[in-house]
From Swiss-Prot:
It comes from Glaesserella parasuis serovar 5 (strain SH0165). One of the primary rRNA binding proteins, it binds directly to 16S rRNA where it nucleates assembly of the body of the 30S subunit. This is Small ribosomal subunit protein uS4. GO terms for cellular component: small ribosomal subunit. Residues 96-156 form the S4 RNA-binding domain. Pfam families: Ribosomal_S4, S4. The lineage of its organism: Bacteria, Pseudomonadati, Pseudomonadota, Gammaproteobacteria, Pasteurellales. GO terms for molecular function: rRNA binding; structural constituent of ribosome. InterPro entries: Ribosomal_uS4, Ribosomal_uS4_bac-type, Ribosomal_uS4_CS, Ribosomal_uS4_N, S4_RNA-bd, S4_RNA-bd_sf.
Amino acid sequence: MARYLGPKLKLSRREGTDLFLKSGVRAIESKCKIDTAPGQHGARKPRLSDYGSQLREKQKVRRIYGILERQFRNYYKEANRLKGNTGENLLVLLEGRLDNVVYRMGFAATRAEARQLVSHKSIVVNGRVVNIPSYQVSVDDVIAVREKSKKQARIKASLELATQREKPTWLEVDATKMEGVFKRTPERSDLSADINEHLIVELYSK
């Protein structure tokens, strides 16, 4: 499946919630009618079956993190293989992606922008350039903006914007140095309560 390149707000309207696909400079409610489905008439969303709800939740999470279907399924398989709660394991794996960590640290305004920074070799992990967005960050890893990329206006703007967001407690960031440390693995209570990972587990368990 190809990566979606269409209007980002359309995806948020389809899921009925902010997927954080835009920078967040303006509230999403000021940009679109988030509580109505996309389309000319913005029809009300029909009541979903159990399967429909499970599928929608999977699509929502997949779109939040910008993951393709095959990648997402592989993450689920890995989460299921690990000890502990499969749903929580899935979210932890997604949060540990380098592009997500770059976004969480405030070096990028969106995960898509973070993915681009990583792919363009603007990010170093423990002093070495890593250009794989799906790279799994480990505890105590130091993630930083590459020296020659620190002058990029979009990175400076993103760090300024990040001051308006809640700071993740599992990360330690020095905005002046443009670097941060992955202090610990996030717990479920650290992550969004708007995600129902149990529905995803039910979907893939069939």
